[in-house]
């Protein structure tokens, strides 16, 4: 076994059946917390979305003794971070908390928003005298006719201001009561009231830094809440595994920026990409493409970084038309041989890393097809009269193989950018780059060698072996499983501490390694009592909508391009609430079509 275990891993060997009895489970228990511990990520379904939002609203309403729309405004301002909101309240007080979020709460609250029909009142907007029952008063005391209020609400909702509709009185910053908005709008525009409700509900996801939509295609309708750290990889209940930070497929040990660049580089080049490559250069700070539209060689990116167009090096802003203060670079020379040599070297380097990346990706796909075959072998072995009855070591080894293949595959994309001459050219000297590259490649090769050995042993026809041979292959698979897990952990530690940790520009971070694989998000369960639900009014208020069920994300583990999303966008569906359940409406359809359905 010395040919595929390093000396450091010899302590992990199991040389007998008794030693290896629970080798994998014991090793994993040291690396991971107990399964009984509460998951750090939760799945918020359409049914639990309202409960999740109400749980946070209720906590703020009870602590500050305010109405629901005021609590919602505060939570949106603080990105639905209840703990941060409470911390500001304790440190700075209620007045500072409210003023910072733009919330106006009046000491005197008018008890009734409506007036008797017998009274005659004048609206200061349309200047008409109307019966009292045609007028409505907000908490701030400003009173206008229902038609003017409705028009004001309609404009605000259509302009995307549903979450912060303010009073239309001059210089009044009070937030309008959601119940009044819903009641008035639903009488004339039920579809708009449903849209209003949907925006309020989805603000919990779109304005919440701890919650994001699952990027599955077609959309599964779920959202994921990561309570501790957004730098994690998570598995939705629909089966999709993705990076919570960038919403692309799980890609550690690559950073999000590295994976975005690698994904674009591997994609078939279109005319647009060719044009961008020819006419733009990457900013040395944020790495976004910048186009030069004339003028001198000093270029300023939208992030504020100035750089030289000729060499791409970061510079200051002081310059003349012909020179940049404190900066000099080799002028452009038409040296065709050097250009061709560098282009050839870059191409060969990319080809090498892409070939290894693709090889492990393809191997993982082939091994995934063998899963059923291996399970059949396990089933046959369990029916045989063998001393060994438990074959969980096979499935554990298979799971370990898939995880380590994924790590190996993405490690080549990481190495391409980490040890290239573009991304970190100012962070490392050539000598430092070579030393770190050798350190990383040593660990990468050890992991690769052990993974290939594990794959070979799992493909053995152990269902046809004798007792002694089954015991022997069992020890081999358990030892290799423990070894590749240890090597994966060491590779992550090397990347986090020795490679990325030594960089001055800390924009590259990776999700931590998990011995048991990507964490599957648990179902969300509201901790608020059912009696607390009486404090909230139903959000339908007579609105109607088309009931539909979102499609499940069948095949959501397909190509990387189908699940990648550049921003935290809401699915293009709208809805209301019927019987306290979310129903969906398509806002792209005409209102009359929706009403007919």
Swiss-Prot record:
UniProt cross-references to CDD domains, sorted A to Z: BRcat_RBR_ANKIB1, Rcat_RBR_ARI1-like, RING-HC_RBR_TRIAD1
Keyword Cell inner membrane assigned: no
Binding site for Zn(2+) 5: 283, 286, 301, 303
Residues that bind Zn(2+) 4: 243, 246, 251, 256
Listed GO MF terms: ubiquitin-protein transferase activity; zinc ion binding
Active-site feature positions: 296
Enzyme Commission code: 2.3.2.31
Name of this chain's protein: Probable E3 ubiquitin-protein ligase ARI1
Organism in which the protein naturally occurs: Arabidopsis thaliana (Mouse-ear cress)
Native organism taxonomy: Eukaryota, Viridiplantae, Streptophyta, Embryophyta, Tracheophyta
UniProt gene name: ARI1
